[in-house]
Each structure stands twice: as C-alpha cells, then as structure tokens.
Amino acid sequence: MKLCDFEVGLDKPFFLIAGTCVVESEQMTIDTAGRLKEICAKLNIPFIYKSSYDKANRSSGKSFRGLGMDEGLRILSEVKRQLGLPVLTDVHSIDEIEQVASVVDVLQTPAFLCRQTDFIHACARSGKPVNIKKGQFLAPHDMKNVIDKARDAAREAGLSEDRFMACERGVSFGYNNLVSDMRSLAIMRETNAPVVFDATHSVQLPGGQGTSSGGQREFVPVLARAAVATGVAGLFMETHPNPAEAKSDGPNAVPLNRMSALLETLVTLDQAVKRGPFLENDFN
C-alpha cells in the first residue's frame, strides 16, 4: 500500500505515527514534530506526525479538549509547511470530514466509532488514507467487516480501495483496564490491510483516575517490542515533552527524550523479524 510518499507492508520497515495526544500550542507542536522528524530521519523510519484538534471522548466534561478545529488545523498545516511532514488527525463526526480532509494527509477514526457504518463510509469517500482503530469491544476478526465497509464505499465512489489501515489499541478487560492480545495483530492481517499497533493507548487505564484516564507508560516498550516481534506494518505512539504536564493522556505518553532510544531498539528488532519468513500459515 502506498501511504503518503512511502510503501507500507510486512515486507517493508515499519512506519511511525507519533505526536502529542492533543494540539496544546503551536510552538510545542512544531518543536515536538521537529524533534521526531530528526529522530526518524536518523533511523530511516517513515514518519507521519499526529495530533488531535479536539478530544471528543473525554472522561469528564471539564477536561481539556483542544484549541478547536480551526486553530488546531491551522497549527497542523504549519507542521506541513514548516517541516514538510505529512500529518494525521482524528475526525469525530461526518460534518467534520470535508474540512479536515482539506488539510491533513491521513484521517483517523476513533475506536469507539468503528461500528458506525455511515461514518466509516464518509471517511472512505474522503479520498484520504484512513487509519481505522479497532474498538476496545471488538474481536480482531470482526475488523474485516469494518475494512470491507470502507472498501465498498470507496469502490462505489470510484476511489482506490487500497487506502485503509487496521489499528489495534487493546481490548477492555474488566473495569478501567485494557490488555493487548498479540494474536490480534496476526488475525487482523486477514483484512489484507496494513496492521498498525497503538502502543500508548494500549497501556491506558480508561477512566482509571475518576475524572480522567490513567495509564502505565512503563509498559509501552514491552508492548511495542512484542508487536514488532509479531510483525506489523506500522506503530502508533503518543509522546510529550513533559507527560506530567500533558493536557490529555499524559500517563500513557512516552517522554519525548526517550523516543530515540525506544525507536532504535524497535528498528533493530523489526529488521531481524522481517528478514525471515512469517511461519503462521505453516502451522495450520
């Protein structure tokens, strides 16, 4: 699959989607994107910057949601203009898609909306690549239906069907907890879409702090290594210069000053895994 200006797939090095959870300010966004660009250039990692102009799904109605669509998109457009990076952001309703698609390179659908057929159809008809997150309530094999919905809508609109990614971000396990089943990554390959692993939301503790979500960022390297060892096309990770002061999802964000070391390890592992054959089908 061609994504932005690079090819993605199990036979290619993993690509990275990374950035702050939410756009907090223009300067921090530019600085964070610039640092990530430097790291990824050094490690030869294809990179897409991500950040949200609005966090529609918050634990509390008083939580920070963002700077608004217009200002958030303006800042993301500055990332493109100043740094030459492709950008990704999530959309939350059909009404937002046209305006967002006019600015960003890749759309993302929130996990909780993966079963909303009209919404998936509208995203698919935007003509943009779409990173479709698997709901925390959804079995991995059910993602085939979601990807098929997107492909059907694209085909009916006369657009390419080869624009959709399936993203794993953990599954609900009791209250305020998520677990990651690495079998899901292999199962989701049956969609014939590139599989992306979200290593930071997978360690989230949804609503675990009462009016906000908690997280266990110390397990991000553990799950990221496991996912790369399983074999993925891409990784998704949120990062922040100072997670303790992040306005959204700080407890599961990777400190920006630790991203280089983590990614260096993951690149080495990815190269080793993709040198050999994937043997899953040989065991049937």
Curated annotation (Swiss-Prot):
GO cellular component terms given for this protein: cytoplasm
Keywords: Cytoplasm, Lipopolysaccharide biosynthesis, Transferase
EC number(s) recorded for this UniProt protein: 2.5.1.55
Pathway: Carbohydrate biosynthesis; 3-deoxy-D-manno-octulosonate biosynthesis; 3-deoxy-D-manno-octulosonate from D-ribulose 5-phosphate: step 2/3; Bacterial outer membrane biogenesis; lipopolysaccharide biosynthesis
Record Pfam families: DAHP_synth_1
SUPFAM superfamilies: Aldolase
GO biological process: keto-3-deoxy-D-manno-octulosonic acid biosynthetic process
Entry's localization field: Cytoplasm
Classification via InterPro entries: Aldolase_TIM, DAHP1/KDSA, KDO8P_synthase
Reactions accelerated catalytically: D-arabinose 5-phosphate + phosphoenolpyruvate + H2O = 3-deoxy-alpha-D-manno-2-octulosonate-8-phosphate + phosphate
This protein's record includes keyword Transmembrane helix: no
Domain of life: Bacteria
A Gene Ontology molecular function term of the record: 3-deoxy-8-phosphooctulonate synthase activity
Protein name, UniProt field: 2-dehydro-3-deoxyphosphooctonate aldolase
The organism's taxonomic lineage, starting at the top: Bacteria, Pseudomonadati, Pseudomonadota, Betaproteobacteria, Burkholderiales
